[in-house]
Structures are given as C-alpha cells and as structure tokens.
A protein has these predicted regions:
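Amphipathic alpha-helical heptad-repeat segments
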Residues: 27-28, 33, 299-302, 306, ...
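Core dinuclear metal-dependent hydrolase active-site scaffold
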Residues: 62-121, 241-246, 250, 261-265, ...
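Short, compositionally biased "basic patch" segments
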Residues: 117-135, 284-311
Length: 424
C-alpha cells in the first residue's frame, strides 16, 4: 500500500522503527516483483511501478524506540518495543487540543512479549498510568500459553535418530532465522550431529538472513552468528545437487504454508519418500497444502504437485511453538498493566476468537468498555472514542434511506413509459 499511496500523490512523512526502515527495501522489492509477475500473468496493468517503491524511501522517517515524535502541534506518537518480529513496535498516539480533554490511544499491532534475538524493552510506567484506549490484537485470543506444545527440538532429535532427512518449510523473515538459531544450539548441545548438512533455500530468506547477521538491527551481538555448522546456501543452480546428494540432510525453504517458493520444487521427491519427515512450523491457513497435510487429508489418496501425482509417505509433523503472536493470557497480562483503561477495542482475529477474547477482557473487569472492532462504527469525538452504530444497523438505515429514491425512480420510469406509449 505504501508505493500505491506515493503513486497517488502522498508526500508526507512515513514513520517507522529503525529496524523496519532497514528491512523495508527487502519486503517492498519482493512485493513489487510478485505483483508485477501476477499482473503479467493476468494481463492487467500493475498497481504501481518500481519508481513508486523508491519514492517510499524519500519520505521514510526512522524513529527511536521510546522517543516521542511531534507529528503536528496536536498529535504526538511514540514507538515502544515489541517481540513480534525484529522491527515490530507498539504505538502510543497522544492527541491534545487546548480546552479539550487529552485522548490517548495505544495500538499493540501484532504483539509478542519476547523475541529469541533480543531482549524486548519494557513499556515505561508512565504510559500505563495514562487514561488509555487500547486497540489489541487477538490472533490467539482463545489459546493459553500452557496449551502450546514445545515439541520441535525433541521431535527433530527423534527424526534424525531414525536416520530420516528433515524438510522444514519456513517464513522468510523471522522463522527461518529462529530455526537456524535453534539448530545451532542443538548442535552445540550434542543433540544433533554436526555431520548432517543444513541447507537454506529461498532468495528472500537469504536476504533477511544476511540482514539479521549484519549488525544493523537491534539483535544482541552474541546472537548475530546464529548459522549452524555445516550450513549451506542453496539457489536454483545448486538445488538439483542438494536433492541428488546421498545421506541425511536438513532443508529449510520457503514458503511456510507450502503453496509457493522453492518448497514446491522439492515436494514431489520429499513427500513421496518414507525416509523424509516434513516439519511444518508456521501457521497454515485453510485450503493451503500445509493445512491439508496437518489435517491428514491425503491419507491413501494421491496428491498433485508440480504436475506430478504422488502419495504421502513422508512423516508429517507440526508445532505452534514458533508463533509470533501472544496468547490470551499474555494479552490479558499486557492489558492488566494499564491503571486507567477506558476502552479496549479487540482487533485482528477470527470473528469468534475476537468475541471470546472480548468477553474475557470484559469479565476481568479492568476496562470500563470493551468492543470488538468491526462490529460497530467507532469514531473519535472531542471527549474520546464513540460507538456510533453496528455494521448491520448501518446497512439497514442506508437501505431504508435509499428506498424512497428507488421508488421515486421507479415511478418516474413508469410515467415515462406511459408517455411513450401515448405518443405511439
């Protein structure tokens, strides 16, 4: 959306965290390439051009964590640290007009209280003491941390002890680097052999991994060298040799849901071989190949991949321990820190999950008002946030208002038809 905004004349400041500003070129360039290829395939005009991507960086304003930025005389924003991924932040918006009550809005964005690569800085006490309105995510608002099974390391150890090779689909940013970090720890602890080669495929994952190791981001110095021993980069030229090589191996490749990226090129050989195990470490949405494998939809049934029909013979494993979103108890713990919580707007989750989490917040009784964002139209008024009406009610009123106009047009058409018939 940023290049599209710039294309249509936006020339204001684009505020972001310092780490995001250093990762953004990778993300936007990749998005542009995907969009360009899609538009060529569908024979439609691209939404924006490469120069629009470049324009974004002209307006970029990297911000320090915890340092207030005066956007204009009445609005101030402050970024606070967030463990979701490197570069993530939570934002405090403070709105102040002479003679009016100050309004404070805290937006969590995608939130996680910790990150394997850094110590997440605490939000200062003064923020929690403000009269506050919070927009909070709820991706896992119906799940507790105690429900998460931390099975990855034990399962990897057991798979390799069975002399099987391991195929791990990963997200290019965050997940690929975290799993490489854990595999290195397992090597150092003697839980997996350093003799087993570890490969990383996927151009985007390579770019992010190089950036993570560069020292430019807020990654702790002792964690910069997270690549395991016997590690190898894989590209389109070396890929055939990796697959043809004998002996045990571990392959990490994009995409995490198995629907795109180099993963598709490996799958026909991997999935049909009982000497392989596939370990899904990312959230897989409905209808993706990853989800279908987790749900065992291809039991005794052929699956078509890259034009080949194969049967699933590889062992399928999955885990939710790498999720980059807080669970319900962690979200409640964050909200509980606010001493004067006026309004909580629950956002970013499945419809039922948002409702369940909103009910938990309401029952916890530490917020004066709790709403599910999207169920109602909410606007900013002089004295705070006001719920106008439900989306259904809005539609009903709109339809009712439009009905007389439709009736009027209908009557007019009938009169015209009558006049025409008389003239004949």
């Amino acid at each position: 959306k940023l290049p599209l905004l710039c294309k249509y004349g936006f020339h204001g400041k684009i505020f972001t965290t310092k780490s995001t500003s250093k990762l953004l070129r990778i993300s936007l360039s990749n998005s542009y390439q995907i969009m360009k290829e899609d538009s060529q395939r569908q024979k439609v005009k691209p939404l924006y051009e490469e120069e629009d991507v470049e324009r974004v960086f002209e307006y970029l304003e990297p911000c320090n964590i915890g340092e207030g930025i005066q956007v204009n005389p009445n609005i101030k924003i402050t970024y606070f640290d967030n463990g979701h991924i490197i570069g993530a932040g939570m934002i405090l918006v403070q709105i102040s007009y002479p003679g009016e009550q100050d309004i404070n809005l805290f937006f969590t964005g995608d939130y996680k209280p910790y990150n394997v690569f850094k110590k997440v800085q605490s939000v200062p006490t003064w923020v929690y003491e403000l009269p506050m309105n919070v927009i909070v995510e709820s991706t896992y608002g119906d799940t507790e941390t105690k429900e998460v099974q931390y099975n990855f390391e034990n399962d990897v150890k057991n798979i390799l002890e069975q002399r099987k090779s391991l195929f791990i689909p990963v997200l290019a940013q965050g997940r690929a680097q975290e799993i490489l970090f854990i595999l290195k720890q397992m090597q150092n602890d003697g839980r997996i052999s350093k003799e087993i080669p570890i490969y990383l495929d996927g151009n985007l994952s390579h770019q992010y991994t190089h950036k993570y190791r560069s020292g430019e981001l807020e990654i702790e110095e002792e964690k910069l060298e997270f690549l395991p021993e016997n590690f190898h980069w894989v590209d389109k030229d070396t890929r055939p040799f990796v697959m043809a090589s004998k002996g045990q191996k571990i392959i990490l490749t994009t995409s995490g849901m198995l629907d795109h990226g180099p993963a598709r090129l490996y799958l026909p050989s991997v999935i049909s071989n009982e000497n392989w195990a596939i370990f899904l470490t990312s959230y897989c949405s409905e209808e993706t190949l990853g989800r279908k494998l987790i749900d065992n939809e291809f039991k005794d049934k052929a699956i078509e991949i890259m034009g080949q029909e194969v049967y699933v013979k590889a062992q399928i494993y999955s885990t939710s321990q790498f999720s980059s979103h807080a669970k319900a108890d962690e979200l409640l713990e964050l909200l509980f820190r606010f001493k004067n919580l006026k309004l909580v707007l629950v956002n970013h989750g499945e419809k039922e999950t948002m409702k369940k989490f909103a009910l938990r917040v309401e029952n916890a009784n530490f917020a004066k008002r709790v709403e599910v964002l999207g169920e109602y139209t909410v606007k900013l008024a002089h004295y705070g946030f006001v719920k106008i009406m439900g989306a259904k009610l809005y539609t009903m009123i709109k339809n009712k208002q439009e009905q007389p106009k439709k009736e009027k047009k209908k009557k007019l058409r009938m009169i015209c038809r009558r006049k025409n018939s008389f003239s004949r």
